[in-house]
């Protein structure tokens, strides 16, 4: 459980760092790209090895790591588009709703436990995710976007689910039960290389402006980003079922982020939001039974 709590803490810290980017004039995509190479450095310091070595190329997890690197970059881009066209609330809800894919996948494909308490907790978790993210006032989201752009939030949801399902697959095939840093750094390296290609085109075309501020932001972002994935894999490797780990992680992140936002950033919550927090606590209790 301690590994799961550490993963949640790192993920919450990521959200707070993102919230500060606009205040300090950070270019989000460039910071994300530099964050991936920071994660690579963390993996090198942790394991002493760099990705794509001759030994790593023969590992059974290599194709999955390459796939995840691509999905990471794609998921970030679609999440950013969702924020642009539908708002932050829709983007966050669609990403957290990935448990609608992950939990049934773990239960149906791998036969993980699905008792009444877990199913009730699963339902409460879904309700809490929606209520905690419920806007305090009406916000313009899909009004002027039409049906032509509905694929953007739907793709955000699907990609978030794909990431978690691949982790479930890797866990059940005992490829990285102990959070192999080579597996993690390969994922981030693949995403970083793809991101560097995009940034390189942006710099060459003049669409992006290089700034050391973005490099520094990427370093600050990369350390907890690496930790969030490492500790999640270690939690799964310790024997915790994926159908338990992912809902707890998603609900825990929303719960901790909401409370932190109220204390640190003085964000106001509606009565509906507080009901969502209460349901999140109840969901954690039922899922943990």
Indicate where each model-derived feature is located:
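Specific alpha-helical transmembrane segments that line the substrate/conduction pathway
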Residues: 71, 83-110, 118-123, 184-193, ...
